[in-house]
Amino acid sequence: MIFLETPIFTRRIKQLVDDDQYRELQLRLLAHPDAGDLIPRSGGLRKIRVGLAGRGKRGGARVIYYWMTARSQIFMLLAYAKNEQDDLSDEQLKMLRALVREEFG
């Protein structure tokens, strides 16, 4: 499995979790790429919870990704803390769908 990252994802994930926590997330997705919940009306985007120190998974971070099964790739799109944002806005969904279409056709 290959992991691809958007620049904004790379920047935000470094602010939210340490290298060990990120590696743990990658290993979880390697074992179960469908672990994240499908986001309605997103064209296949998934959202997975990531625990943050002192907050656990429920109050931690959210990672938005797309699993391209045919290419065995996971496109890491966006990461944010739960206290910053609950769900993606319609505009964010539209932008992320466009990124996925651009990358995978």
Short names for language-model regions:
Residues I13, L25-Q26:
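Short Gly/aromatic-enriched secondary-structure transition segments
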